Amino acid sequence: MTRTKKTTAPAKTKEIGLGFITELDRYLFGQGTHYKIFEKLGAHPKTYKGKAGMYFAVWAPHAKAVGVVGDFNGWDPDAAPMSPLADSGIYEAFIPGVGLGELYKFAITTQEGMILFKADPYAVHAEFRPGTASITEDINGFKWDDAAWMETRKKADPVKSPMAIYEVHLGSWRKKDRPQKEGYYTYMEAAHELADYVKKMGYTHVELMGIAEHPYDGSWGYQVTGYYAPTSRYGTPKEFMYFVNYLHKKGIGIILDWVPAHFPKDAHGLADFDGQPLYEYADPRKGEHPDWGTKVFDYSKNEVKNFLIANALYWVENFHVDGLRVDDVASMLYLDYGRSDGNWVPNKYGENKNLEAIEFFRHLNSVLTGHLTGAMMIAEESTAWPGVTKPPEEGGLGFTFKWNMGWMHDFLEYMKLDPYFRKFNHNKMTFGITYATSENYILTLSHDEVVHLKCSMINKMPGLNGDKFANLKAGYTFMMGHPGKKLLFMGQDFGQYHEWDEKVSLDWYLADEPLHKDLQKYYSDLLHVYQKYPALWQLDSDWNGFQWINANDGDRSIFSFIRRDETGKKNLLFVINFTPVARDDYRVGVPKSGTYSLILDSGHGLYKRGEHAFSARSKKRECDGQPYSFAYPLPAYGAAIFKFN
């Protein structure tokens, strides 16, 4: 039995063993509520009986014996045996003279006598691949100076704040022309260039893929072996702290991809950690993920839940990360996800819901909320599971936001169509509004949509090259006007032709080509308009924030709508044409008399801000069911945004 039985909490923090772990630590870990367990397990510089060295602790309840191995003892499994800590399943050892920067692993002897060399699950630093050892490190002592950002974060309501996310894979965003570590930018180098780019473009947040340590580049960081270790591809933990700190000082938030759904079977990782299933479900019908060939975390074990929940807090509190995007939530919620009939285990009610995963999410999100960190929890959930962003006390899962996968699929299907056929698929662009306020949504055009022969965003568009760019500008304008926060993957803001490849840099030379430069400038202007006008983000989850003007002009494939702010006085009007036919005198209905001034127009040629200055006084003439209207020369593939004066 690997789960600690429920007992009464110790009256005092009595020291046991070497004295670094108390009875209360043990109790809380067994209950799954030791949210600072990473300060106890793992490797920590300590002084014991007057001698400086390293304290090691690991949870391995099925082990026959455990030792610490490393460069400091010639990797001899018998050189530094660890002692069991009562009946907790925890082993500990103090080794004098071991300092920082030492390679180490745990040598775990199974009940069958086999020795497994495992990386430390709680290691904060790891060897650069193909090495698999953990590295002793102290993450304390970094001098943060982002206090103003952190204080604002605690008070802000992200649901009513602007959020335009730039999704980035650091290893392929840019590369240096140097042999060290395959030309990867370091965290410190990337901080400066990335912050400059993001700030200039108008993004509010960066979402980073693949920061937790992972052995295989091709997994993009979604098969993690070091949950507590920022990947050594780009530097040390404190250099990653520098990265976060620097972006915060520039007013840019940081979101990390986080993977509590599954983990790989690599020999040094969590799989069969002590010779038996420990972090994973023992029954392969629950513990094996058939689609990915990975292991599934056992959400019924308190110690496993503790490992994950403490890890979420670790990134948010120790590294000042502003949010976690939880990968593949659907695979956790459904017991039959990716499994054929007869190869999954129903819950106690005979259903396919994973009750343990549901409880885990509610616990996780309640803890993040309860610690008043101000951090966001974002669910990549691809089904219609209800209440993903509702609080647990209302029966929800407690996430801050949910990726709007339904909108993304409909939007891309529509945009890929030849313009002639769009009129037969008009509902693909209007349907999303029917459920836009059912959750707190993020509209995503992520890395998943520009790989595996799906084409880059620009190459999804129909027509000749110029038409592709005009289409994409119109599409991006529709996205910016639609309720929901925004996310775009790197390279898609300047029209990268190639699909994303994690092995090579983006084709930055394209950003100097006229059509690409024009697209990049237009998307940047969209982002700055987005940040400037609260109508585009204040009421994303409120029906009062959106009004169709004309959702039914399918024959001409034109959409018009209004976005409102909380005052109802600083509204924006969007008019978007998804055909190559210009409408020289397109009449738009509006609810109020006044002047409508153009603030952004994509045009059909190269975009120049202010080139198409236009304002019109609405007339008392019914149109689109509205009492007033005005006419506007709407170009082919034209997108226009007006403000009301």
Predicted segments, located by residue:
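Short glycine-biased active-site loop of nucleotidyltransferases that positions the nucleotide triphosphate
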Residues: 83, 216-221, 265-272, 389-390, ...
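Short catalytic/ligand-binding loop motif for oxyanion handling, primarily in non-cytosolic enzymes
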Residues: 114-116, 174-176, 214-217, 262-265, ...
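Carbohydrate-interacting/catalytic domains
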Residues: 1-162, 187-198, 202, 466-469, ...
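Substrate-binding/active-site clefts of carbohydrate-active enzymes
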Residues: 127, 147-160, 169-353, 632
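Conserved alpha/beta catalytic core and glycan-binding cleft of carbohydrate-active enzymes
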Residues: 320-322, 340-503, 510, 531-588, ...
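Short, flexible loop/turn elements at secondary-structure junctions
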Residues: 60-62, 86, 97, 169-174, ...
